[in-house]
């Protein structure tokens, strides 16, 4: 947000103080305390371009040219003497387009101009080509303001019953939800830490991040632009009905429109921004007027940006189908319960479904529990969760439960797993039990080290790199002769396992396993779906020594091997 302090500034010296009132119970997790975003002082002439007053869109893109529309807002006493000049530069600093447009007697507070870039380079996932537009506001022959806007040339399209298209290419969202806290580094913006997080997620095969459940820092969005990572930019975790005592519900009536408008205006030029989210699991899902609030917020966004879809993280399928909140949204976003996708598709008009929040599988890095069984809300005396990736929460599921829906239902456009990294707060299933204080949901732990689950997702999502990962570790003194299952996460279709040189058999991913035609409400109780995506030896017994796995390609050729001791 910004605050115009002009009426309060006096001649000569001034003291500007930023004071914060961090109350308890402001959030359901740890959002940070104190001043954790950067603050800037911006000076403007009386004739100027307002904050976030330049909007750039690329409504037409071909191989030969890109049409660029620049809308420049301005504040001036004499509008007929105003002109806006925009020069576009490529990433080599070369000028590629220019326009100068004068205001007319009929101009209100905005000048619109069209430019064309020949042979445009597109911004894309992992290939983030960026242009810069320098816009100057003239009053007569005098430059009164100058704004530099970084943007990308790219297109987004939703096709009902088909999917999501980026630059004319169909894609699936392979996304993660991320809180903004940086674990032991704290919540203050740290560009190096954010860059590392994005880089690790890209290595896992992630192409999109949902900024749950807060508006992201400008540095975060800029890094996503520069690194080629898509963003689903989220606004609120709470509307007018409270979840916590001192949450956003206290401010929603007076501030929601302004805050949401500022969010969209701030980031509408950023090519990494794929979609907007108006909320997450809000209590209004279960009231009759909930759809009206959703429409109100969606309309606010559409006043500022018509180029991106608007979604909402909804976790109560029955309620949002009944009160029409789901039907109201441009893009349906469902949190968990993928077994409800088919019903939602039958009843709703959008004919596309996004897994806006999925999985919530829990695990602790390097911790393995026996026997290896699928469990919900499992608790142990050491306050840990098993890294065999077979445990989840009462409302959630395992990764493969989402993958099989994403692959077998053509109207799904992808998912955002909960979460990419562990974070402070929400230590489900232990909740407030001491000393548990951080989540178990992440594919990467609080220290920034990958869990086994990182490699499970990598084996499925990263098509460019080889993945061959063995779990668990093989130091089990005292478990000699006991059943100790071995899992292999790999992008290859099959592998053979050896313990101390003796073959334990070959496993192949079972592609015959399909999503059931008639699904039951709830999750499976077994690990049948996992056989389509993981290689599992459930009966191996521990003996000290060496575990070796040999992976085979589609032709049955041995192409990779790995050992642990």
Label the model's feature ranges:
Residues 29, 42, 46-61, 67-69, ...:
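Active-site-adjacent substrate/metal-binding segments within catalytic domains
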Residues 7-10, 15-79, 150-155, 163, ...:
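Non-catalytic, glycine-rich low-complexity segments
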Residues 10-11, 71-159, 537-545, 553-554, ...:
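Extended acidic/polar, glycine-enriched regions
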Residues 316-345, 361-377, 420-441:
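Substrate-binding cleft/loops of secretory-pathway carbohydrate-active enzymes
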Residues 226, 251-362, 397, 460, ...:
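Active-site neighborhood of glycoside hydrolase catalytic domains
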């Amino acid at each position: 947000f910004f605050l115009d302090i002009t009426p309060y500034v006096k001649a000569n010296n001034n003291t500007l103080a930023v004071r914060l009132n961090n109350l308890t119970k402001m959030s359901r997790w740890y959002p940070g305390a104190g001043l954790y975003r950067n603050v800037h002082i911006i000076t403007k002439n009386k004739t100027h371009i307002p904050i976030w007053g330049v909007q750039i869109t690329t409504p037409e893109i071909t191989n030969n040219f890109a049409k660029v529309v620049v809308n420049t807002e301005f504040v001036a006493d004499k509008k007929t003497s105003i002109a806006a000049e925009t020069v576009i530069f490529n990433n080599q600093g070369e000028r590629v387009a220019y326009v100068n447009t004068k205001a007319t007697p009929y101009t209100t507070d905005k000048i619109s101009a069209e430019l064309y870039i020949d042979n445009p380079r597109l911004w894309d996932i992992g290939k983030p080509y960026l242009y810069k537009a320098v816009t100057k506001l003239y009053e007569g022959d005098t430059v009164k303001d100058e704004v530099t806007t970084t943007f990308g040339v790219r297109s987004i399209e939703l096709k009902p019953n088909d999917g999501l298209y980026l630059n004319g290419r169909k894609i699936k969202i392979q996304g993660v939800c991320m809180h903004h806290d940086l674990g032991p580094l704290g919540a203050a913006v740290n560009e190096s830490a954010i860059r590392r997080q994005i880089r690790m997620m890209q290595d896992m095969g992630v192409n999109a991040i949902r900024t749950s459940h807060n508006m992201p820092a400008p540095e975060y969005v800029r890094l996503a632009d520069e690194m080629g990572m898509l963003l689903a930019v989220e606004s609120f975790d709470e509307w007018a009905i409270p979840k916590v005592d001192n949450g956003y519900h206290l401010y929603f009536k007076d501030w929601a429109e302004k805050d949401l408008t500022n969010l969209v205006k701030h980031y509408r030029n950023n090519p990494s921004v794929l979609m907007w989210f108006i909320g997450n699991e809000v209590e209004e899902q279960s009231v009759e007027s909930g759809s009206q609030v959703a429409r109100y917020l969606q309309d606010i966004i559409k006043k500022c940006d018509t180029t991106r879809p608007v979604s909402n993280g909804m976790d109560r399928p029955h309620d949002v189908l009944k009160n029409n909140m789901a039907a109201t949204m441009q893009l349906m976003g469902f949190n968990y319960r993928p077994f409800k996708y088919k019903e939602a598709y039958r009843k709703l008009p959008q004919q596309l479904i996004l897994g806006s929040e999925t999985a919530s599988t829990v695990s602790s890095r390097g911790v393995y529990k026996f026997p290896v069984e699928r469990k919900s809300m499992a608790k142990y005396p050491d306050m840990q969760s098993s890294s065999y990736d077979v445990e989840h929460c009462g409302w959630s599921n395992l990764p493969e439960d989402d993958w099989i829906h994403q692959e077998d239902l053509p109207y799904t456009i992808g998912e955002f797993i909960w979460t990419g990294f562990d974070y402070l707060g929400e230590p489900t299933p232990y909740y407030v039990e001491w000393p548990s204080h951080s989540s178990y949901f992440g594919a990467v732990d609080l220290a920034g080290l990958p869990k086994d689950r990182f490699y499970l997702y990598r084996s499925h999502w990263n098509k460019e790199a080889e993945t061959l990962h063995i779990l668990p570790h093989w130091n089990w003194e005292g478990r000699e002769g006991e059943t100790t299952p071995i899992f292999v996460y790999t992008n290859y279709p099959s592998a053979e396992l050896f313990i101390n040189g003796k073959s334990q058999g070959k496993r192949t991913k079972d592609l015959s396993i399909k999503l059931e035609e008639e699904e039951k409400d709830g999750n499976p109780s077994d690990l049948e779906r996992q056989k389509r995506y993981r290689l599992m030896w459930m009966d191996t017994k521990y003996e000290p020594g060496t575990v070796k796995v040999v992976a085979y390609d589609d032709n049955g050729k041995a192409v990779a091997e790995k050992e642990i001791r």
